[in-house]
């Protein structure tokens, strides 16, 4: 199997599409984002928020998972929604009684720390964030770019839906190296697709040891509760993702 680059500098330097000047520019952008992400950690801490960054392909079920948390649990949370256009996902959550603020990125395929900082100020005008336990950031649907931008989250959770197939982990290794946990979503569709859960587990193990994996269906309350319990445990532990973006 082709060697997988685990280090950011190594990935940049080995990219045939980037020359020396381009690598320098990208490195500066990412370094600036890293500094802002560190500032965000202090802001989250001051607000008493435990932050979870949800990443996946478009349509993998990030918004549906958040709706399920609202339906099946008593978690006190608010949401920052990332999409290129429209506020449809934010409206879906608001209909469930969840305070949500939509970030529309235009042509940008990911959220950046500076976007979160300004959106957080807007969200604070919508709800009393000190009454919240958690902030969920629903990143732009994309298995590539969000993996390069630290948002200061305590947990980075990646969703992989059954219809996407079981081969994505090693095809998009940078994303799954970010993962503090992986949710295999739309688990109720397992019987309709040739999806090998053991392959996903094996591929994950090649990238990162002991990544918790959850099978989740929005139709199965207990599957959602297991993820809720995992997130709550990490919050109690004060866990902060050690992944270096």
Per-region residue spans from a language model:
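Walker A/P-loop
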Residues: 63
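Conserved C-terminal guanine-recognition region of P-loop GTPase G domains, centered on the G4
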Residues: 146-153, 162-211
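Nucleotide-state-sensitive switch-loop elements of NTP-binding domains
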Residues: 16-55, 60, 69-154, 165-167, ...
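Long, basic/Gly/Ser/Thr-rich N-terminal segments
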Residues: 1-12
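Canonical P-loop GTPase G-domain recognition
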Residues: 189-245
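Cofactor-binding loop segments of dinucleotide-utilizing enzymes, especially the Rossmann-like FAD-
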Residues: 82, 161-162, 218
